């Protein structure tokens, strides 16, 4: 028996965001593993030895020397390859160890759960740590991608502001550095769509990082270029704009000049075009870009002095590729040399928010180049946002100069020239300022360039110092990667945000003059944008006097001063900016930490350093002469005005984290629509109440907590619905008149779900009972309840399998008992009458509606006569008077002891189903009174009605007790598959291997923890002795993770169809039964006949009677022939209405409903809802462990479908019950007694009466047929043959064939048989197979660019390695030209297809113009 004795340790990573990389204990103990036993059976011993804090089901084993995870299902002998090198020394005499830690799937689930349920500081801390988590464990990336982690990142990023998006992009960049992560991004096009959407953000750092990630994506493989085109088309089509609009808005420099973004955007276009295999796709992309005006943009940059060489090179590459594809072979290849550094300046990147003079300039240039009608893309905001006018530009420039902005003032030409009037230079103000600097007026002279170059060395030195400082801060951050430190960091960041908000509000007063005359005087939202906050800070700093010392809080509005000041410093020298990793991760993290510490003024070194950097930034602004702050502010003024107005209109506190990019986030939110419900149910948590949250965050924190109490995960599914819900809350409160919790949305939701919302006022007897639960504290609703309510708001069509409930409309949501009773409450006591003259009694009160006026009060008796019925029956409704008896009897007859119903004049005329009264539509029946008087004459001793009382006998229950659990398990094993088959079946939810009964039996055999421990200890103590069958079975079951959750989920899946059918079919039967009774003529004939008979026998003139009396009709017999009253009713109906039916065959749905307990059905429906919600919890628990993605997706879709179907069932149930109440009103039931009517009993009475009626009717028809046959028999009885036929003297008539009842039946059968023979001939259906479209795909070519990714497997890998990889990728993409100097030869679908630019310039033939629909347009005229 081979063993392995080695050191064991555990790693406390139960919380992935609060974990450490150092295993414990520092002096690890030894554990002896058996190499012939599965590791899963020995895991409990390791767990017990280490006393690890992990849950045993969540544990796994990892080797310390190579980080490989061991398979718990296999033995050590089977995993010898993984143990290679394990016995070697780890250095300094230490041995390697086996580490017990949390399974990858559990950690990933915890990560996603944390991201999905966190907000505020917790979410910031989690996103901040995500990149480091992926760096610490490379295996986590694959699990994260498989578990839909990318979808979670997109969803969180779609709802967050730019700071959170920067954190997410950092983590996404780390994911994409791994092949597993890149493959996950390739397979999930939503990620690329989100990245492309972020290009339209107004925050420069977000745009820059998104562009870098897209560059890495396209550079990775040529096959990724079509995926990018697919994502671009999907996003822009949903926005209603032309594809590649976001890229063009960057190239058109909508929000200022930023050469770095221009280079990235143009490189992305070139890389995408170079990876396209076919010419059609190439021209589709190029034509879109040409329509958007890339030709004019390219010429403007190429003709402009001082344009960055990298940008010039990328523009030339595009032009060469286009000309080559058009067949122009005379073009020269693009220049191969590239500068190592590029110029960059700070601005707000294009978000498509407004279109200024630059856009109009491009349209005019397009008209001149015969491109008028095809290039007019508009973004959704282009029509509403105003554009800059020349006079506004002059006003703004004057205000900037008057306000004391030295950097801008120094950069203005001394000639004081205003906006150029030439068409070629009408650009936005930032571009105008740059053109003025680069114009031949003398600004860009050689001395100015020398001055710029002399400052480049100083900037380079400062940049290197800053990088070293940031790296040091990053190392400190990594060493302090603990929960408390992160919590402190998040708290400091939150305080910084609060102070920045307050400082921004204070600065707004100083910046009033910066806005245009029509703009609102509030620039507070500017402080939430990195670029706009930079610009605002620069304005306010320069506005103050030079001698005024600046408080350290002056830079509080800048969330990331270093990461934004760095490209500012590099603008003039054309230096290479720090790429993805450093720019995204180190600069941002270090800068935020530094700003927080400067705010706290703890280390004086940090404060002085921050002050020095702020001064350096001012120097950079003056040296660069770029006025990036001014350009950023001026170009975003109108957008900020628009957002400020939007934020003032929004009165709810749902967005406490600052101003968000609503347009971009809205687009991001639209990307994920199919998976949101499943994500919510899989990862939803219960939120803490506001009292449990921390209370030290100031007013903004309290506002956020109160908003979170209302807007939980259900409202996060669609943020627009959350806004509308809170805005319409006041409107909804008007409808809820009787609710005490008016200010609580939760209370409103509770009332909505319980059905009390639409009731309004209630009867006086019910008021005290209904007010009690309102005053009780409302139970907090879970996230599942919120998500469930959200799903209820938009249910599917009312169809369950093949059962159609679509005729249940919204009017069935209203219970006539609630509405009508509420509106007609019994009025309070009338006021006392005024004193009358001479003390006479007051006049009687006026009559109620149509009732007969009461008689005058005799004398001084003021007591009115007692009412005929008790008070509850009337409830304030006037009763229709009962007329005088219409029959006069000479003899005393027996009485029918029915309950007379006197119809009320109830105000339910608006309800279609109880608008009329059944009894009012019945026709009066003429009865033979003399015969009835004879038949039902009362004798001296009246017959008492016999009552059948069924004695409820108690059913004896046989209770079988298991004497030994082992015997019970062994008996159960006889009907179950083998244990190994059971385990595989449970893990795979294999319905063929295990049926429903087997699952229920296994549920009774689930081992307890005590049993599991005893079996494992016994096995380890006596390894040679095999376990018994019961013990082995329990041990096999215990090795299945989340066994109980799996079994309950599986049981629900297998039970659901049957349970749903048991609920839906009775509801459909009840609905159909109501329709059958309402439209049944035979029932009307029976009731009218019975009413006429009863009125004669009772000597009354009743209008109706309760249908419960139908139960007694067969028991009442006449006193002469002892025949039942039903027999006489049936006889009259058959005689008076020969076309009536047997009734029973027409109300089959009522008969089926009579067998259903509808109270139990309602309980089953509630139980289905509870089990469905519990199944989500079970699936959540199972998903933590190893579960196939396909299986998880299938189960998630199944549970989502179940939830929707259960909601439909609840709606159907409510509406059918309300319709049944309306039906009872229609049938004449008094309103006060309707709630007491049992549906099962009512249907049973109708069904049993119909069965009795059918039996009686058959007997009556048989007697009638016998009499008819008897009459026919009498026609020939005694006649001789000589009286007729040939024996008679007269000519005989042709013999007529007797055509009795049997003949009619035979003839009908004959016709039916002929019809069957005609229709049963085989029909030939012509089925034309669909023509298959033959498609050809071009073999993918290998990427010519070398893809070398050097990764360090050591655990001490830092951000520098990842950032260096990202830098090398982006640098190679932007600087190194393609090895193919001449673009590739693409396959052509048409030999003569050219680009749109070439086609329009070379002119169109009349035939081509007509084909394109351009006849008569300006293109032909030009």
From Swiss-Prot:
Changing residue 440 to L: In CMH28; uncertain significance. Residues 448-480 form a coiled coil. Residues 827-849 have a biased composition (Pro residues). GO terms for biological process: cardiac myofibril assembly; cortical actin cytoskeleton organization; sarcomere organization. Residues 827-858 form the FH1 domain. The modification Phosphothreonine is found at residue 775. Residues 323-464, 521-666, 687-708, 754-781, 821-849, 1262-1305, 1320-1357, 1374-1410 are annotated as: Disordered. Expressed in the heart, kidney and brain. May be down-regulated in various types of heart diseases, including idiopathic dilated, ventricular dilated, familial dilated and perinatal dilated cardiomyopathies, as well as ischemic heart disease (at protein level). It comes from the Eukaryota. GO terms for molecular function: actin filament binding. The modification Phosphoserine is found at residues 345, 375, 763. Residues 357-366, 1264-1278, 1385-1400 have a biased composition (Basic residues). Changing residue 653 to C: In CMH28; uncertain significance. It is linked to Cardiomyopathy, familial hypertrophic, 28: A form of hypertrophic cardiomyopathy, a heart disorder characterized by ventricular hypertrophy, which is usually asymmetric and often involves the interventricular septum. The symptoms include dyspnea, syncope, collapse, palpitations, and chest pain. They can be readily provoked by exercise. The disorder has inter- and intrafamilial variability ranging from benign to malignant forms with high risk of cardiac failure and sudden cardiac death. CMH28 is an autosomal dominant form with incomplete penetrance. Interacts with nestin/NES-based interfilament (IF). Interacts with SQSTM1; isoform 4 threonine phosphorylation disrupts SQSTM1-binding. This is FH1/FH2 domain-containing protein 3. It comes from Homo sapiens. The lineage of its organism: Eukaryota, Metazoa, Chordata, Craniata, Vertebrata.
């Amino acid at each position: 028996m081979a063993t392995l004795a080695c050191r064991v340790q555990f790693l406390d990573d139960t919380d992935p965001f609060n974990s450490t990389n150092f295993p414990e204990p520092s002096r690890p103990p030894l554990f002896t593993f058996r190499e012939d036993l599965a590791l899963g059976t020995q895991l409990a011993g390791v767990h017990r030895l280490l006393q690890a804090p992990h849950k045993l089901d969540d544990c796994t084993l990892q080797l310390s020397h190579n980080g490989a995870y061991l398979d718990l299902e296999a033995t050590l002998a089977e995993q010898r390859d993984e143990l290679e090198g394990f016995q070697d020394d780890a250095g300094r005499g230490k041995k390697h160890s086996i580490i017990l830690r949390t399974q990858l799937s559990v950690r990933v689930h915890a990560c996603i759960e944390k991201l999905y349920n966190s907000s505020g500081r917790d979410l910031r801390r989690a996103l901040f740590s995500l990149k480091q988590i992926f760096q610490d464990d490379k295996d986590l990336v694959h699990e994260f991608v498989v578990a839909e982690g990318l979808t979670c990142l997109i969803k969180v990023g779609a709802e967050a502001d730019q700071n959170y998006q920067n954190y997410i992009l950092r983590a996404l960049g780390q994911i994409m550095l791994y092949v597993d992560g890149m493959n996950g991004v390739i397979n999930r096009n939503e990620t690329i769509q989100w990245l492309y959407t972020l290009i339209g953000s107004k925050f420069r750092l977000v745009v820059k990082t998104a562009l870098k990630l897209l560059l890495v994506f396209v550079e990775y493989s040529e096959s990724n270029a079509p995926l990018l085109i697919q994502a671009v088309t999907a996003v822009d089509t949903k926005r209603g704009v032309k594809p590649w609009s976001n890229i063009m808005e960057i190239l058109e420099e909508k929000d200022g000049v930023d050469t770095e973004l221009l280079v990235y955007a143009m490189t992305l276009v070139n890389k995408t075009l170079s990876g396209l295999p076919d010419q059609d796709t190439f021209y589709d992309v190029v034509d879109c870009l040409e329509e958007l005006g890339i030709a004019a943009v390219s010429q403007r940059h190429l003709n402009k002095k001082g344009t960055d060489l990298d940008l010039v090179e990328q523009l030339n590459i595009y032009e060469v590729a286009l000309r080559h594809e058009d067949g122009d072979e005379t073009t020269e290849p693009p220049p191969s040399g590239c500068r190592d550094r590029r110029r960059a300046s700070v601005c707000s990147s294009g978000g498509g928010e407004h279109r200024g003079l630059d856009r109009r300039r491009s349209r005019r240039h397009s008209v001149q180049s015969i491109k008028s009608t095809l290039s007019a893309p508009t973004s959704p905001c282009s029509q509403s946002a105003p554009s800059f006018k020349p006079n506004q530009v002059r006003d703004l420039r004057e205000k900037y100069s008057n306000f004391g902005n030295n950097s801008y003032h120094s950069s203005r030409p001394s000639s004081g020239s205003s906006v150029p009037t030439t068409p070629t230079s009408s650009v936005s103000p930032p571009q105008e300022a740059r053109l003025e600097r680069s114009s031949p007026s003398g600004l860009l002279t050689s001395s100015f360039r020398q001055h710029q170059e002399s400052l480049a060395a100083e900037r380079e030195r400062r940049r290197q110092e800053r990088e070293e400082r940031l790296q040091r801060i990053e190392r400190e951050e990594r060493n302090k990667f603990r929960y408390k430190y992160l919590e402190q960091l998040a708290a400091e960041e939150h305080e910084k945000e609060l102070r920045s908000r307050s400082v921004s509000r204070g600065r707004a007063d100083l910046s009033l003059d910066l806005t245009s005359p029509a703009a609102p005087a509030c620039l507070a939202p500017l402080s939430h944008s990195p670029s706009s906050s930079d610009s605002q800070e620069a304005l306010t700093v320069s506005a103050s006097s030079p001698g005024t010392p600046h408080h350290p809080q002056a830079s509080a509005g800048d969330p990331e001063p270093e990461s934004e000041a760095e490209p500012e410093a590099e603008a003039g020298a054309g230096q290479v900016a720090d790429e993805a990793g450093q720019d995204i991760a180190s600069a941002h993290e270090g800068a935020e930490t530094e700003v927080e510490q400067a705010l706290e003024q703890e280390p004086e070194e940090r404060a002085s350093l921050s002050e020095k950097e702020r001064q350096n930034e001012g120097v950079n602004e003056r040296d660069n002469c770029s006025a990036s702050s001014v350009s950023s502010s001026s170009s975003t003024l109108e957008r900020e005005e628009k957002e400020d107005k939007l934020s003032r209109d929004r009165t709810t506190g749902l967005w406490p984290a600052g101003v968000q990019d609503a347009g971009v986030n809205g687009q991001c939110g639209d990307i994920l629509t199919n998976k949101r419900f499943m994500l919510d149910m899989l990862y939803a948590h219960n939120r803490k109440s506001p009292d449990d949250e921390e209370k030290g965050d100031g007013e903004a924190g309290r506002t956020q907590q109160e908003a979170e109490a209302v807007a939980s995960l259900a409202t996060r599914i669609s943020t627009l619905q959350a806004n509308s819900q809170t805005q319409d809350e006041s409107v909804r409160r008007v409808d809820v008149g009787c609710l005490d919790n008016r200010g609580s949305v939760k209370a409103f939701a509770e009332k909505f779900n319980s059905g009390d919302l639409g009731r309004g006022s209630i009867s006086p007897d019910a008021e005290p009972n209904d007010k009690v639960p309102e005053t009780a504290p409302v139970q907090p609703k879970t996230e599942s309840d919120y998500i469930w309510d959200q799903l209820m708001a938009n249910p599917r069509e009312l169809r369950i399998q093949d059962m159609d409930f679509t005729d249940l409309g919204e009017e069935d949501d209203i219970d006539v008992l609630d509405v009508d009773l509420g509106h007609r409450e019994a009025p309070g006591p009338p006021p006392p009458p005024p004193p009358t003259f001479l003390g006479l009694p007051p006049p009687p009160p006026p009559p109620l509606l149509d009732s007969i006026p009461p008689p005058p009060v005799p004398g001084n008796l003021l007591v009115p006569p007692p009412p005929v019925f008790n008070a509850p029956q009337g409830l304030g409704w006037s009763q229709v008077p009962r007329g005088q008896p219409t029959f006069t009897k000479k003899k005393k007859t027996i009485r029918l002891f029915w309950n007379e119903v006197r119809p009320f004049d109830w105000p339910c005329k608006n309800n279609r189903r109880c608008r009329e009264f059944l009894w009012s539509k019945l026709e009066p029946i003429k009865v033979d009174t003399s015969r009835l008087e004879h038949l039902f004459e009362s004798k001296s001793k009246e017959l008492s009605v016999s009552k059948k009382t069924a004695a409820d006998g108690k059913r004896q229950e046989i209770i079988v007790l298991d004497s030994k659990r082992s015997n019970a398990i062994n008996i159960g094993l006889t009907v179950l598959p083998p244990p190994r088959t059971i385990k595989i079946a449970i893990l795979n939810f294999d319905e063929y291997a295990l049926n429903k009964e087997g699952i229920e039996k296994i549920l009774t055999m689930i081992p307890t923890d005590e049993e599991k421990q005893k079996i494992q200890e016994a096995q380890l103590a006596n390894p040679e002795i095999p376990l018994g069958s019961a013990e082995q079975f329990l041990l096999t079951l215990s090795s299945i993770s989340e066994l109980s959750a799996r079994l309950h989920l599986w049981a629900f899946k297998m039970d659901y169809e049957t349970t749903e059918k048991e609920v839906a079919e009775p509801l459909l039967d009840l609905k159909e039964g109501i329709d059958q009774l309402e439209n049944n003529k035979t029932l009307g004939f029976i009731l009218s006949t019975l009413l006429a008979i009863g009125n004669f026998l009772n000597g009354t003139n009743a209008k109706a009677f309760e249908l419960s009396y139908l139960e007694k009709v067969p028991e009442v017999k006449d006193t002469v022939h002892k025949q039942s009253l039903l027999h006489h009713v049936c006889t009259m109906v058959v005689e008076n209405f020969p076309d009536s039916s047997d009734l029973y065959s027409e109300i089959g749905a009522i008969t089926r409903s009579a067998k259903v307990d509808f109270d139990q059905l309602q309980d089953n429906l509630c139980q289905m809802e509870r089990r469905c919600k519990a199944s989500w919890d079970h699936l959540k628990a199972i998903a933590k462990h190893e579960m196939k993605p396909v299986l998880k997706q299938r189960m998630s879709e199944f549970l989502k479908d179940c939830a929707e179907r259960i909601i439909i069932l609840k709606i159907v149930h409510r509406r059918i019950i309300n319709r049944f109440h309306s039906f009872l009103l229609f049938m004449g039931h008094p309103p006060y007694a309707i709630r007491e009517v049992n549906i099962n009993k009512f249907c049973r009475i109708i069904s049993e009466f119909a069965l009795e009626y059918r039996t009686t009717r058959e007997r009556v028809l048989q007697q009638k047929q016998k009499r008819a046959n008897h009459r026919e028999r009498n026609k020939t009885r005694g006649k001789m043959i000589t009286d007729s036929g040939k024996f008679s003297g007269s000519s005989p008539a042709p013999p007529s064939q007797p055509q009795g009842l049997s003949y009619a039946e035979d003839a009908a059968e004959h016709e039916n048989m002929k019809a069957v023979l005609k229709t049963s001939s085989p029909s030939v259906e012509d089925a034309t197979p669909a023509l298959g479209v033959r498609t050809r795909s071009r073999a993918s070519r290998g990427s010519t660019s070398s893809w070398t990714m050097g990764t360090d497997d050591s655990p001490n890998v830092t951000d520098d390695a990842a950032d260096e990889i990202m830098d090398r990728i982006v640098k190679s993409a932007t600087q190194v030209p393609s090895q193919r100097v001449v673009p590739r030869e693409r396959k052509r679908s048409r030999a003569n297809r050219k680009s749109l630019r070439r086609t329009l310039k070379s002119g169109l033939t009349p035939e081509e113009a007509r084909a394109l629909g351009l006849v008569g347009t300006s293109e032909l005229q030009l």
